[in-house]
Amino acid sequence: MARSVWKGPFVDGYLLNKADASRASGRSEVIKIWSRRSTILPQFVGLTFGVYNGHKFLPVQVSENMVGHKFGEFSPTRTFTGHSSDKKAKRG
């Protein structure tokens, strides 16, 4: 179920502070975040975030198309190694 419109988007407070500090400094450094549940806001466009996937921080360059989505959508947590092949079918 979607979040109620009257509540507004969810963003962790520390994330807003880090984004504002990064914009003020003018440096294009990666902002490390653990909050995969936070919504991407328009003020984050152009910034690079390192989103933690449980193993390492994956760099995510925020574009206008990402606004309204969650950070976790752009940092996959699982690696698909493929299905095992059927040995009987290969022998043919």
From Swiss-Prot:
PROSITE patterns for this protein: RIBOSOMAL_S19
Listed Gene3D superfamilies: 30s Ribosomal Protein S19, Chain A
Keyword RNA-binding: yes
Any single GO CC term annotated in Swiss-Prot or TrEMBL for this entry: cytoplasm
Organism domain of life: Bacteria
GO molecular function ontology, one term from the record: structural constituent of ribosome
Coiled coil: none
InterPro entries, per database record: Ribosomal_uS19, Ribosomal_uS19_bac-type, Ribosomal_uS19_CS, Ribosomal_uS19_SF
UniProt keyword Ribosomal protein present: yes
Biological process terms in GO annotation: ribosomal small subunit assembly; translation
Keyword vocabulary terms for this entry: Ribonucleoprotein, Ribosomal protein, RNA-binding, rRNA-binding
Family named by the database record: Belongs to the universal ribosomal protein uS19 family.
Function, in words: Protein S19 forms a complex with S13 that binds strongly to the 16S ribosomal RNA.
NCBIfam families assigned: rpsS_bact (TIGR01050)
Name assigned to this protein: Small ribosomal subunit protein uS19
